[in-house]
Amino acid sequence: MSWDEGFADRYDEWSAGMTEDVPFYVELARETEGPIVELAVGSGRVAIPVAEATGRPVLGIDTSPAMLAHARERADTAGVELVLREGDMRDLELDEPAGLVYCPFRGLLHVPGWADRRRVFERVAASLRPGGRFAWNAFAFDHSVGARLDGSHQDEPVPHSLRYSVGDNRIDIALDNAGTSSLWWATRNEWLGLIDVAGLEVEALYGDFDRSPFGDESREYVWVTRRPG
């Protein structure tokens, strides 16, 4: 079974423990004028509450047909409008500039390398209206955590194994009886470089979804950036 098929079938189990991000992105959407776009929309875990809270459609983009099928089914059940599109965030093109583009659940970490991430950031910046926001969250970079996880097998939230590659700051996640997916960590300075090269401005860097400041003990980057104008 491929990662796409295996992970799509178990995504809701995998993400069950991640709920605190939903109110954060919902609040950003409520503050937004203009179209709302979610990158790596997955099964609609965040997009559906955003659409429910705002009463507006959310454009969701994902590379996985299996995940989009889950999102479509869940949106129909919830009675909300998601406009779902199969596509790569590196090639983002919108019919109308967005007021908010967001990428929850560390989705940007699946984009490997500086060049590809730069392309994402530049496409997002070009797709925002003046004053529009780009928000995302990601693990705070920590070699010691990666080293501790290397070679481990975990049963929760679903059975999987982890491998850490020091050379390129990569974590490989292998689901039992399914494929493997990878995350590439980025440092704070690397994120700041991407923000700068795309012509965005930092509005806030939080250490959690309660909007507490990022500090030495923070384990999550929660970024909110803005296109000038």
Give the label of every model feature segment:
Residues 118-130:
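A short glycine-rich, Lys/Arg-flanked "PGG" loop and its adjoining helix->strand segment in the class I
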Residues 188-229:
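C-terminal lobe and adjacent flexible extensions of AdoMet/dcAdoMet transferase-like proteins
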Residues 47-91:
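Class I SAM-dependent methyltransferase SAM/SAH-binding core
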Residues 93-100:
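A short acidic, Gly/Pro-enriched loop at the edge of an enzyme's catalytic core
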Residues 102-104:
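A conserved beta-strand element that flanks and buttresses the S-adenosyl-L-methionine
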Residues 1-42:
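Conserved class I S-adenosyl-L-methionine
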Residues 113, 135-193:
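SAM-dependent methyltransferase
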